[in-house]
A protein has these predicted regions:
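Active-site neighborhood of glycoside hydrolase catalytic domains
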Residues: 570-574, 579-603
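Extracytoplasmic
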Residues: 750-918
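Classical eukaryotic N-terminal signal peptides for Sec-dependent ER targeting/secretion
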Residues: 1-9
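Active/binding-pocket-proximal capping segment
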Residues: 519-527, 547-548, 593-604, 840
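Ser/Thr/Asn(+Pro)-rich, low-complexity disordered segments
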Residues: 3, 19-482, 486-487, 491-492, ...
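Structural helix-adjacent loops and short alpha-helical linkers that scaffold large soluble proteins
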Residues: 429-443, 508-523, 584-597
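Aromatic-rich carbohydrate-recognition surfaces in CAZymes
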Residues: 409-430, 487-527, 569-577
Length: 918
């Protein structure tokens, strides 16, 4: 079968009619998002990675294959095929004896820095190998089936020369590894020496058991138990030969199951007090095994704080009941009426101790879901000088036009991130009631978001017909697979698209007229790519990124990693489900809104269990908890670093971007205080670039006024606007135990002077010195796209690059999209000649001069010059006069003109304007 759609027909048995009436199912269902073909604007393209080792029964619908699940290495061309079922790791043994190897990963420490452990990982050895005589020559391995929710998969092993097969189910949390033999002769082996079987020496005999139970004691002090459904099975010891380990070989072929499990406690002297209880429990449930999982989610119809999800395990075997491992975030939340805790634990590689539960139905109640707001309320701002500074920067930052290459260039991640940062200015303008600024802001966002909608951005999104998803076309080009962080191979989709969806949600909220069916379908397509809730969607897999068993998403797609799937940015994980929720609110889709609320709550709790490490965290080694955050989190390794560097500000900052209204629900004051005092306070002053602002925003949770003062002069860039950082800091709420928000006296925000440089407009006819552009700063008197004043010789507090030339100055380092504004007084109406003193070693530069409207980039502005091409003058200091005839009249009186750089690469000394004689 292609994919199993699990519809819980027995749900009414779990809930009374009255209870069912207050809950709304949010998945799986077919009407939360449309199932139609993705919009035609998404060009159809084939991925350069194709699935391998997939059974022919799945060939007709490859778009249903999951890319980011725990077993996806079975479908790609990598060095091994492994599945992190956890607590075990199951993989294919690609050397004799062929078959399935079962590893219980054991933790070991890596590098230290002082008293902190920088990373730890787990060993993976061939603790048990389940093979068959018929696989001695070769083996063929195929992924034969999987469930919709990413909880299980079925793998088949066979030989092209021998009849029969082996099948194994890869199920998250399975307590036993189960292999179904079909007319195959089982073999059991280990990389460790098998010392005893059922208490007897392993060699020199055939081992039998009237119950089909074989206790294997290994020389690493572990005990494994093998359960055979065929109680007549005999296992004969065969000594090791060359590189082939010794095996316990069955005396005959069988059709039935072998199940193997590790006793959770090692053999010690004296024995662990729960050793016997663990063995008894494993024996009791040895006859029943899970084959699939299904998922159902609900939101309360009237209480947005309440949601729940159900994982139902399908079983086979003797019906004795299911024994299954659960992570810490499940253990105290699973409804006891359907699943029972046993108090028997086995450590997972990176998520603490897993506990054995009994029962086939897990219902997890989430009764403290976070509140959802567009923006923190301005009522939190209690100091008028903070408000004045916010308004000062809001006006300045909104006035700077967006550049297409910055918000819609070759990276969807960076482009959409920058666009969302600007979009947050719109939210502030709306909250503060600044209608004019809001309209200007929304115009900019809408115009640039159209680049994505029209697929004219630098990395156009296309529909992948191989795996069923939306990817960037740049990564499909030969030799360019790493483009946009390997997003064409399903890396980081929930990070990238979270920003896009967030922008769309804000546009829909603040400008409802923007919404139409085409835009809704386009944005919904991105949601379907990452998080389709519909098990019957024929174009996208269900819940590609989100792992309902782990409680969070995985960023790694079709790229192999020895330590399993990974994720480093928990805040961007949250941002996707927050953005999806807000999109649901803005468009009136209550099902998507409800699902987003639930997933945000689930991931928030999981993040605080495993990624953000308070002092009392029990899920990681104590010396690793001292880092306060995990860094790169794999399924079987945790490394206090990032993919882009090991600076402390990177490692912590990536867990805190973007800051939104949901952030305070994820990062509470207790954690922020510990993180600040133990890791951030000592590095913040030397943090690179904008990262110090990110760290100060976290500090604002416990000291908002001190943080606000720091943010006035800390870094900012296109991805984090100073306005938003200040607003977020100023609106931090009070807290009783972990913050104080001490009073800080701020300087007054400047009153922005605008207009002519000297206070008097330049008289026309006459000369205008290039460096005497208008007052008002960035976005008013000028727009400069590179940081700082590169010349630093004149007006050093402003970003225009000015250098000494002769007895005066010139403006240099001109870049695409920059402009200079000049206020002039025109003596009489008419057309005017212009002579520009320019210098350039190339003939690539160009500009034009406009007047009216909002200047450069405003279609209503009057172009006074047409495009002016700058010639090669022989060098940066060889200035030449460039004459340009006026082609549009200027009216007498005061006006503003803008010199708009089209293509940079030239210097400007001055320009003269004289009356054109007609």
């Amino acid at each position: 079968m292609l994919k199993v759609v699990s519809i819980l027909l027995g749900a009414s048995l779990l809930f009374s009619t009255a209870q069912a009436g207050i809950w709304r199912k949010t998945s799986p269902r077919g009407n939360s998002l449309p199932k139609h073909e993705p919009p035609a604007s998404f060009e159809r393209r084939a991925n350069t990675i194709f699935p391998i080792g997939v059974s022919s029964v799945l060939d007709d619908q490859p778009a249903l294959l999951e890319t980011n699940k725990f077993y996806s290495s079975f479908m790609i061309d990598g060095p091994e095929r492994a599945a992190w079922t956890l607590p075990y790791i199951i993989s294919v043994n690609d050397e004799l004896p062929f078959g399935i190897q079962v590893a219980y990963p054991k933790s070991f420490e890596g590098e230290r820095e002082g008293d902190r452990l920088k990373w730890y990982a787990t060993t993976r050895t061939k603790d048990i190998i389940l093979s068959a005589v018929e696989l001695h020559t070769n083996q063929e391995v195929a992924l034969a089936d999987f469930d919709d929710a990413g909880l299980s998969a079925l793998v088949t092993l066979s030989s092209p020369t021998e009849a029969g097969s082996m099948q194994t189910w890869l199920v998250r949390g399975m307590a036993y590894t189960t292999v179904l033999y079909n007319s195959y002769t089982p073999e059991v082996s280990s990389i460790h020496a098998i010392v005893r079987v059922n208490g007897r020496a392993v060699s020199g005999r055939t081992h039998t058991s009237s119950t089909g139970r074989f206790v294997l004691e290994l020389n690493d002090d572990t005990t494994w138990i093998v359960y055979s459904s065929d109680t007549t099975l005999g296992l004969t010891y065969v000594s090791a030969v060359d590189d082939i380990p010794s095996v316990l070989k069955a005396t005959k072929p069988m059709s039935g199951t072998l199940r193997v499990t590790r006793v959770p406690y090692e053999i010690t002297t004296p024995e662990h007090p729960q050793y016997d209880a663990a063995v008894a429990l494993l024996d009791q449930y040895s006859g029943s095994y899970p084959t699939k999982g299904s998922l159902t989610t609900w939101m309360h119809k009237t209480d947005t704080k309440r949601g729940k999800y159900q994982i139902k395990w399908t079983t086979a075997g003797d019906g004795s009941g299911l024994l299954h491992y659960a992570f810490p975030h499940h253990q105290d939340k699973v409804r006891s009426s359907t699943a029972t805790r046993t108090g028997i634990y086995l450590a997972s590689p990176t998520k603490g101790d897993m506990e054995l539960l009994t029962g086939t139905t897990w219902i997890v109640n989430e009764n403290t879901l976070p509140d959802f707001e567009w923006i923190p309320s301005m009522s939190g701002i209690t100091y008028d000088r903070q408000m004045a500074w916010i308004m000062y920067y809001l006006e300045a930052e909104i006035s700077v036009p967006l550049l297409k290459e910055e918000v819609a260039g070759a990276s969807v991640y960076f482009g959409a991130k920058h666009l969302m940062a600007y979009c947050q200015l719109c939210l502030v303008a709306a909250e503060l009631g600044s209608a004019d600024l809001l309209e200007t802001c929304l115009d900019q966002v809408e115009e640039n978001f159209d680049e994505y909608l029209q697929h004219t951005n630098g990395n156009a999104l296309v529909y992948d017909t191989v795996w069923g998803g939306v990817i960037g076309e740049e990564g499909l080009k030969e030799g360019n697979g790493a483009a946009d962080f390997y997003a064409s191979f399903y890396n980081d989709h929930h990070f990238h698209y979270s920003y896009v969806i967030n922008v769309a949600a804000v546009l829909a909220h603040l400008r409802p007229s923007w919404i139409d069916d085409t835009k809704v379908a386009w944005v919904n397509t991105l949601i379907r790519d990452v998080n389709s809730p519909d098990a019957s969607d024929p174009y996208f897999p269900q819940f590609r990124a989100f792992d309902w068993f782990s409680g969070h998403s995985w960023a790694r797609g079709l790229l192999f990693a020895y330590d399993g799937k990974d994720q480093e940015s928990t805040s961007e994980d949250v941002n996707f489900y927050y953005a999806m929720t807000m999109w649901g609110i803005a468009t009136g889709n209550t099902l998507i809104e409800g699902l987003g609320r639930l997933q945000t709550g689930v991931v928030t709790r999981s993040i605080n269990e495993y990624f953000l490490l308070k002092d009392d965290n029990q899920n990681h080694p104590p010396d690793f908890v001292k880092n306060k955050v995990t860094g790169i989190f794999f399924e079987s390794k945790v490394d206090y670093t990032t993919w882009f560097g090991g600076n402390v500000e990177y490692i912590h900052g990536i867990q805190n971007i973007p800051a939104t209204a949901i952030t305070e629900s994820v990062r509470d004051a207790e954690f922020c205080k510990q993180e600040w005092e133990q890791r951030l306070e000592s590095v913040v002053e030397t943090a690179e670039g904008t990262w110090n602002t990110v760290l100060y925003m976290s500090y604002a949770t416990i000291q908002k006024n001190a943080a606000f003062e720091k943010i006035l002069t800390s870094g900012s860039d296109a991805g984090l606007k100073r306005t938003w950082a200040l607003y977020w800091a100023a609106t931090r709420p009070p807290c009783d135990d972990f913050c104080s928000h001490d009073t800080v006296v701020l300087p007054h925000a400047p009153v922005v002077q605008t207009g002519a440089f000297s206070g008097v407009p330049a008289t026309i006819p006459g000369r205008i010195e290039a460096e005497e552009y208008d007052l008002g700063g960035q976005g008013v008197g000028y727009s400069d796209t590179d940081p700082g004043n590169s010349g630093g010789q004149f007006r050093p507090s402003e970003a225009v690059d000015i250098q000494i030339f002769g007895e005066g100055y010139n403006v240099g380092w001109m870049r695409d999209g920059e402009y200079l504004r000049y206020t002039i007084e025109v003596s009489e109406t008419g057309e005017w000649l212009r002579y520009f003193s320019v210098a350039s070693p190339t003939s690539l530069g160009s500009f034009h001069v406009v007047t009216g409207g909002n200047g450069c980039g405003d279609n209503s502005a009057k172009n006074l010059s047409g495009m002016v091409a700058v010639p090669n003058t022989g060098g940066w200091a060889n200035f030449a006069a460039l004459g340009v005839a006026g082609n549009q009249p200027l009216s007498a009186g005061q006006t503003e003109i803008w010199l708009c750089v089209i293509t940079g690469g030239f210097n400007l000394d001055f320009f003269d304007m004289s009356r054109r004689v007609l």
